[in-house]
Amino acid sequence: ANGNIASVLQSTKGINVLSPTWFYLNDNSGGIASLASSSYVDYCHQNGIEVWALVSNLENPDVNAESILSHTSTRDNLTNALISAAIQYDLDGINVDFEALNVDAVGTSFIQFIRELSIKCANNGIVLSVDNYVPSAYTSFYNRAEQARFADYVVLMAYDEHYAGSEEAGSVASIDYVTKGVEDTLQDVPAEQLILGMPFYTRVWSETPIDGDGSTGETDNVVDYALSS
């Protein structure tokens, strides 16, 4: 995918930041695996585009993200690895995309990780952004207000209102869902720090009657929207 950057940018306009998924948790000591590319970064910089590399916790099922975040030594290993990679590849920023964390296991450790990473980012001129679900009771431990104190930007993932596991078919991101997500996030995050994440895909649903009782089962296919000018 790194090699397609030129063709992708040729058919788009108005982009000032790209956030490729380049890093993921690779072991329980806080090490990361990397897909980063210097030529990708160079090409973006030549075209006036910043690169905020994304770090994910979802790619390696053998890694316990909650355990890494809950120990000072492994958090330190992780933050150091990210800063080292950012310097090596001349990255403009780091985007943290840690999803599906277990609140009982992680507690306040996630926000402590953001605090510690933010200090190292600031010391090295690296922009820090953090991805977030739409506000709800079960995601309150992500602590968006505290994120806004330390991160440069808080990113709202305003999509997956309905998904493959939903009990009913529906929109990926209806206007009411997105509006409420933005309004609720703005209660904790200053507007100038909020980035709205919109989906470039939709879901095509089909309903199948179940046992003739009037109920239905839903299945979906994801269809990407092509970026174009």
Residue ranges and their predicted role:
Residues 1, 16-20, 51-55, 94-96, ...:
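Hydrophobic faces of well-ordered beta-strands that scaffold small-molecule active sites
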Residues 56-66, 94, 159-166:
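Substrate-binding clefts and substrate-entry loops adjacent to catalytic sites
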Residues 6-9, 85-98, 170-177, 196:
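Electropositive, surface-exposed helix/loop patches at the edges of structured domains
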Residues 27-35, 80, 103, 107-228:
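Substrate-binding surface in catalytic domains of secreted glycosidases
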